[in-house]
């Protein structure tokens, strides 16, 4: 119908339905208004009044759920109708200019009704957009909508004064009524919004109305105030009311700012027109836009005129404003762009799973307790959380109100009735309120609704309000908490404590006026039962305690065991996805919110300055200055590409290998490279090493989180879809920044996911690849496929996981794909060859430990009893469990020696990583839960430690270490990764092996991992029962605990040397019982004087010995403990040159094992001894002037023939106190320094370390004597930089006898300065 017909119909309905009330109001208007003023209006309903009526869509006041004049349903129909009539009369007065107090006769249209009709027509005329050239001030004011309540920051901008009225309901209602009426209130035209293109400036004060307008406002003000207060009360007290979702958008200060409305309301009229033309009735959108309804075939409405363009805003301000709008959209009842929306319920399937409870037992959302909610975080320094998401106010620390309230709160032991962040930790208040809610007969709901407050509490509340910058204390704007006793919700969101939501939900129920006392008691009992399992899991995870009753329902004893039986029958029990109680099996942060946070950190990583403009002290490593940084950036960029491949492979595994089903991947494109900031020139992304390292850290975090989410079945739920989209976005961002600079990889990629990552880095579309993968899946799954019409995929559903955990349908692609678990249409005949059922989801390796106890053959952490040297693992690590059948399948592989397989059984994390590397189980109902294990190169290297010592019972000493990036004991550089970066501050595997081999380690020596071409040979250590275990090795924690329990079972003690820094100790690391010998130390390259004091050339072969650094001091203690614990075993020989041999590139080939024995050298060099040595590869070493030692390693022919190729000179160890070391090389003087400068210890694989403790040990320095009468008498030493030095010119016929080693046990007894002590 047309606009006028609709309004006439409304007028007729209003006249017929409200004739008696209107007539009575006209005849006895003064008496009714006096009664309304006396009783307070509809805010105080009579006990005899019934429930609120259902809103009639044909009545104007109720047909505007989103307009904002009436925030909730009326509590009394008569009073509501009277208030609506008053509102209509108020708006009719400016249009008609006639009095409205004339009586109306029965059956005759009264002047009052004519005035109402005239106001409607006038409103319709004024809401039709017209392009006048200019408008005067009165028309501009008339076109403005009433200003809704504003946020504290807006009020501060408007310059309003703060009133010090108390924060009671009357003040709130008065303020709400004032803002509903408008500033200084004028009755503005309904539906008229500011021009969307107008500038966002504060509105000028409204002009005063004429005298008779004020007269009508005074006569109608009390009743309008009552209606407005009722709407504000109902809208704030009950968020579930029929009109609260839209009314709160007009009454909520955080959701209705002029900035938001100016940008978004322009699209309402077209959207409403489209909805109405499609057959819909006039809804909130049409009324909101202020455009009358029109017939389906009517012409489209004219577009509003374009005003002057708004001034340009900064991108940061625009982005922040849009983000705030999105955050407030859920509260305001708007969509993601800020437009008002009316929620349409979707079709809900109530199947047997939902009725039995199995559907709810399988519920997962992808989020992990303990990880911050996306967008939540701590407030800026000096501020506390206040208002909406991301808002804050200045802190009140030191204010007398806050200090007094804090002292009172700490002394009371009860929850504070008015809580502020200045009182202390929010966790304490949350814990007190939660415990109060579970205390019977405590009247918790009554306390939340109306707590007894002291004068100091009122003073604190007023002080917090004043410092927030708000002008008036309104009950409508977002404060983050519905009750003053409950802390701001942002603290629960930042901590990831979903259990803290109980206080807010209970307070919302307590503050509601829609329930009586008995109903609130029922709701509180419901909340207690619902939150009890969640609180039990979260609190147990925090305290490390076992969750009682498996985290199940706390009320299972009262006969509702039906909760478990049907669920157990319908859900697969071994799967982790079937049990929502095991969410803490994943570390905090490794969930959907953690992936989103990692994407935010990756996007916000700052750019660094170019290499040339940076500090110039980087040239002490391998390569100098900018060249070294560029080389490092290239290596890190390659690692970023590998991490991106890992992310897409994890996503592909999570969606059963179907890349087309990964959310967001079909339309993924490389993001534009980040632009340099305004600070100045920045290094390009591919050369920015610090930012690349930050990116690599976040990419690896995302990869690990996705793997854990896949193992738990969290990728196919709502939060998993968000995490997948965020992961694809992270890959796209890195691909756009690094793709143009990375070389093209010529090798064949092992998976389609890796190929997808490379296509992104090459700025190519993924659709052909996705089409190929879908086509390949079709050819494998359905050889005789159904007709094309039966398999056509056309689904407009959003990227959301299907219900019930069904496999995700593929995205749009150019090839067809079968719809998973889709039934054929009702009228279509099924195809002749039935298609096989979809492949079941991959089983999860880890579940929760069973309540009856773990199986001895299962996979779980065997924490040793009693006290321990290392920290205990978390409760989640102790609860992780792998079924015995899965353990047997995963460990039955020739890669794992049978004696070492129990170490895998002791480490559920290792079993989960093996399950992730398994292929999908073969179709056809095979008994195996996992497919064959893919024994890749990284897995082989991670499991190579099992072959150091064949039998676990032969292990006597375990050395734990943390390698540098790029160091690998199992492969050296054969793994293909980037070379390690030399560091003088932190030592890794290279320095550890050099100390065990009694030699120095430098960037140009064979001991440095950057020069390795293969895995070092440590078989000599394994033969002594010494096991080297890296924190990156497979089952690191399980191996240590297995060896400890095995030694305890054999009634012996294990010796554990922990050379891992505390910062590098892995989360949930191994537990070492105190019954074993334990020595903690560090690996420091700076103990070498050549690294610590490079200017002291006379000390370049000297090493500082200490009992806290991995070296001779620690070795002496280990050897003494070994001799005491194993008196019948051969003595340990830790610091010996024969312990370690390296594979490096030499003149005899790229994979030479050094130190090479003299016999091996002579056999290798024999072909060059036929007189043509100058033309051979050994010519430089056999030349007359060849240096004997290059970087302290045997090089010349005579040196190699005597000690072997690459045999190192032995260092001199000097024991200095800490104060002397801090004093510099000048502290080492006298005979010991002379000894260190002249001593030249010849290579000897069996010689013990030479330690100088004091000057008495410094005898005549040993020298190398050459027995050749025709050759050189001195020893020529060459450095990598080209310097040559000749030492020992005195000739001799034989080498003097070796100096006797120092008795280390005697030195330990005299260690008075703690160098070798505990």
From Swiss-Prot:
Domain of life: Viruses
Protein name: Major viral transcription factor ICP4 homolog
Compositionally biased tracts (Acidic residues): 74-91, 159-174, 1303-1318
Record carries keyword Nucleus: no
Tagged with keyword S-adenosyl-L-methionine: no
DNA-binding region: 319-547
Similarity remark: Belongs to the herpesviridae ICP4 family.
Comp. bias regions, Low complexity: 228-257, 268-278, 309-320, 566-580, 844-863
Domain description: The N-terminal and C-terminal domains are required for the transcriptional activation function of ICP4.
Subunit structure: Homodimer. Interacts with transcriptional regulator ICP27; this interaction is required for proper incorporation of ICP4 into virions. Interacts with host TBP; theis interaction helps the stabilization of the pre-initiation complex on specific promoters. Interacts with host GTF2B.
Any one GO MF annotation of this record: DNA binding
This protein's UniProt keywords: Activator, ADP-ribosylation, DNA-binding, Early protein, Host cytoplasm, Host nucleus, Phosphoprotein, Transcription, Transcription regulation, Virion, Virion tegument
Bias (Basic and acidic residues) ranges: 133-143, 547-564
Source organism of this protein record: Human herpesvirus 2 (strain HG52)
Pfam (any one): Herpes_ICP4_N
Residues covered by region (Disordered): 1-108, 123-324, 542-580, 606-630, 780-873, 1291-1318
Gene it is expressed from: ICP4
Subcellular location: Host nucleus; Host cytoplasm; Virion tegument
Biased composition (Pro residues): 44-56, 299-308, 799-808, 821-843
Protein task: Plays an essential role in the regulation of viral gene expression by both activating and repressing host RNA polymerase II-mediated transcription. Binds with high affinity to the sequence 5'-ATCGTC-3'. Activates transcription by recruiting a form of the host TFIID to promoters and stabilizing the pre-initiation complex formation. Negatively regulates its own transcription. This immediate early (IE) protein is absolutely necessary for the transition from IE transcription to later viral gene transcription.
PTM (free text): ADP-ribosylated. The long stretch of Ser is a major site of phosphorylation. Only the phosphorylated forms are capable of interacting with beta or gamma genes.
Gene Ontology terms: cellular component: host cell cytoplasm; host cell nucleus; viral tegument
GO biological process, one term: DNA-templated viral transcription
Positions with biased composition (Basic residues): 1-11, 206-226
């Amino acid at each position: 119908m047309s606009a006028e017909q609709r309004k006439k119909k409304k007028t007729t309905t209003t006249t017929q339905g409200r004739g008696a009330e209107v007539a009575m109001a006209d005849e006895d208007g003064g008496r009714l208004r006096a009664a309304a003023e006396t009783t307070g209006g509809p805010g105080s309903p009579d006990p005899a009044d019934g429930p609120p009526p259902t809103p009639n869509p044909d009545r104007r006041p109720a047909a505007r759920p989103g307009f904002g004049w009436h925030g909730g349903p009326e509590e009394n129909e008569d009073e509501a109708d009277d208030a609506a009539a008053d509102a209509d009369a108020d708006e009719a007065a400016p249009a008609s200019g006639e009095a409205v107090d004339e009586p109306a006769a029965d059956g005759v249209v009264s002047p009052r009704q004519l005035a109402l009709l005239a106001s409607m027509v006038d409103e319709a005329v004024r809401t039709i957009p017209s392009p006048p050239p200019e408008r005067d001030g009165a028309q501009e004011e008339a076109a403005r909508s009433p200003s809704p309540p504003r946020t504290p920051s807006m009020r501060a901008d408007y310059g309003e004064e703060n009133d010090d009225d108390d924060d009671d309901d009357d003040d709130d209602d008065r303020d709400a009524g004032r803002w509903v009426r408008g500033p200084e209130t004028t009755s503005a035209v309904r539906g008229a919004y500011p021009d969307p293109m107008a500038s966002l400036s504060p509105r000028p004060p409204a002009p005063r109305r004429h005298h008779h307008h004020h007269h009508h406002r005074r006569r109608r003000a009390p009743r309008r105030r009552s209606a407005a207060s009722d709407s504000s009360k109902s809208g704030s007290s009950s968020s579930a009311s029929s009109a609260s979702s839209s009314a709160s958008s007009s009454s909520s200060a955080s959701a209705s700012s002029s900035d938001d409305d100016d940008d978004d309301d322009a699209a309402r009229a077209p959207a409403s027109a489209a909805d109405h033309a499609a057959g819909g009735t006039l809804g909130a959108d049409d009324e909101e836009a202020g455009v009358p309804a029109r017939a389906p075939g009517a012409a489209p409405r004219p577009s509003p005129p374009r005003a002057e363009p708004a001034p340009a805003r900064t991108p940061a301000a625009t982005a922040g404003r849009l983000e705030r709008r999105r955050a407030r959209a859920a509260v305001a009842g708007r969509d993601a762009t800020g437009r008002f929306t009316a929620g349409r319920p979707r079709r809900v399937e109530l199947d047997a799973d939902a009725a039995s409870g199995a559907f709810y037992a399988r519920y997962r959302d992808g989020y992990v307790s303990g990880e911050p909610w996306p967008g939540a975080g701590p407030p800026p320094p000096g501020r506390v959380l206040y208002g909406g998401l991301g808002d804050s106010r200045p802190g009140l620390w030191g204010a007398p109100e806050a200090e007094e309230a804090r002292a009172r709160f700490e002394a009371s032991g009860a929850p504070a009735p008015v809580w502020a962040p200045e009182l202390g930790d929010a966790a304490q208040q949350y814990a007190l309120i939660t415990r109060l809610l579970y205390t019977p007969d405590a009247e918790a709901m009554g306390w939340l609704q109306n707590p007894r407050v002291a004068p100091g509490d009122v003073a604190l509340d007023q002080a917090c309000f004043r410092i927030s910058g708000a002008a008036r204390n309104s009950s409508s704007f977002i404060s983050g908490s519905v009750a003053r006793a409950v802390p701001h919700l942002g603290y629960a969101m930042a901590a990831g404590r979903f259990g803290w939501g109980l206080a807010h939900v209970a307070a919302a129920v307590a503050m509601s006026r829609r329930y009586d006392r008995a109903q609130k008691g029922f709701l509180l009992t419901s909340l207690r039962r619902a939150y009890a399992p969640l609180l039990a899991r979260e609190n147990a995870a925090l305290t490390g305690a076992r969750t009682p009753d498996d985290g199940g329902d706390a009320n299972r004893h009262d006969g509702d065991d039906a909760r478990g039986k049907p669920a157990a029958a319908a859900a697969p029990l071994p799967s982790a996805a079937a049990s929502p109680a095991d969410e803490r099996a994943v570390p905090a942060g490794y969930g959907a919110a953690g992936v989103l946070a990692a994407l935010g950190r990756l996007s916000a990583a700052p750019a660094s300055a170019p290499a040339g403009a940076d500090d110039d002290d980087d040239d002490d490593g391998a390569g100098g200055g900018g060249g070294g940084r560029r080389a490092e950036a290239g290596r890190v960029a390659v690692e970023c590409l590998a991490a991106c491949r890992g992310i897409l492979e994890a996503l592909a595994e999570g969606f059963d290998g179907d890349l087309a089903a990964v959310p967001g991947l079909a339309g993924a494109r490389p993001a534009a490279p980040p632009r340099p900031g305004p600070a100045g020139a920045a290094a390009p992304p591919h050369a920015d090493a610090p930012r690349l390292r930050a990116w690599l850290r976040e990419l690896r975090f995302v990869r690990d989180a996705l793997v854990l989410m896949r193992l738990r079945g969290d990728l196919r739920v709502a939060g998993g879809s968000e995490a997948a989209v965020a992961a694809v976005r992270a890959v796209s961002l890195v691909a756009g920044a690094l793709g143009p600079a990375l070389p093209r990889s010529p090798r064949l990629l092992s998976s389609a996911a890796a190929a997808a990552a490379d296509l992104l880095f090459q700025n190519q579309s993924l659709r052909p690849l996705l089409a190929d993968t879908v086509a390949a899946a079709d050819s494998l799954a359905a050889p005789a496929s159904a007709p094309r019409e039966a398999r056509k995929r056309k689904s407009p559903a959003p990227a959301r996981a299907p219900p019930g955990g069904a496999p995700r349908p593929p995205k749009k692609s150019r090839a067809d794909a079968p719809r998973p678990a889709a039934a054929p249409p009702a009228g279509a005949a099924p195809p002749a060859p039935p298609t096989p059922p979809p492949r079941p989801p991959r089983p999860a390796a880890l579940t929760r430990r069973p309540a009856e106890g773990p199986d001895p053959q299962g996979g779980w952490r065997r924490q040793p009893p009693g006290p321990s040297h290392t920290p205990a693992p978390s409760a989640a690590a102790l609860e992780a469990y792998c079924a015995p059948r899965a353990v047997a399948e995963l460990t039955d592989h020739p890669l794992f020696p049978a004696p070492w397989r129990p170490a895998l059984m002791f480490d559920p994390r290792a079993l989960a990583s093996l399950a992730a590397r398994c292929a999908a189980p073969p179709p056809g109902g095979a008994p195996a839960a996992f497919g064959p294990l893919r024994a890749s190169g990284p897995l082989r290297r991670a499991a190579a430690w099992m072959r150091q010592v064949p039998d676990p019972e032969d292990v006597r000493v375990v050395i734990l270490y943390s390698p540098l990036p790029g160091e690998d004991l199992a492969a050296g550089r054969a793994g293909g990764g980037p070379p390690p970066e030399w560091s003088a501050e932190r030592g890794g595997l290279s320095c550890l092996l050099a100390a065990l081999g009694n030699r120095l380690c430098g960037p140009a020596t064979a001991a440095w991992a950057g020069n390795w071409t293969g895995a070092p040979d440590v078989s000599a250590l394994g033969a002594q029962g010494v096991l080297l275990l890296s924190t990156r090795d497979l089952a690191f924690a399980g191996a240590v605990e297995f060896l400890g329990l095995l030694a305890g079972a054999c009634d012996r003690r294990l010796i554990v040397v922990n050379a891992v820094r505390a910062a590098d100790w892995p989360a949930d690391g191994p537990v070492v019982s105190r019954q074993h010998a334990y020595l903690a130390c560090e690996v420091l390259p700076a103990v070498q004087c050549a690294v610590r004091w490079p200017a002291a050339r006379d000390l370049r072969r000297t090493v500082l010995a200490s009992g806290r650094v991995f070296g001779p001091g620690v070795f002496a203690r280990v050897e003494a403990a070994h001799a005491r614990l194993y008196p019948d075993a051969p003595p340990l020989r830790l610091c010996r040159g024969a312990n370690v041999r390296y594979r490096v590139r030499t003149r005899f080939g790229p994979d030479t094992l050094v130190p090479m024995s003299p016999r091996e050298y002579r056999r290798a060099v024999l072909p060059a001894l036929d007189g043509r040595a100058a033309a051979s590869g050994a010519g430089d070493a056999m030349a007359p002037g060849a240096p004997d030692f290059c970087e302290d390693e045997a090089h010349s022919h005579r040196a190699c023939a005597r000690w072997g190729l690459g045999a190192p000179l032995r260092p001199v160890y000097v024991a200095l106190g800490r104060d002397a070391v801090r004093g510099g090389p000048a502290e080492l003087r006298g005979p010991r320094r002379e000894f260190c400068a002249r001593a030249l210890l010849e290579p000897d694989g069996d010689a013990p370390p030479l330690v100088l403790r004091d000057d008495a040990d410094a005898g005549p320095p040993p020298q190398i004597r050459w027995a050749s009468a025709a050759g050189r008498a001195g020893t020529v030493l060459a450095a990598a930089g080209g310097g040559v030095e000749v030492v020992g010119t005195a000739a001799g016929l034989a080498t003097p006898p070796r100096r006797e080693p120092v008795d280390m046990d005697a030195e330990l007894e005299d260690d008075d300065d703690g160098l070798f002590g505990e």
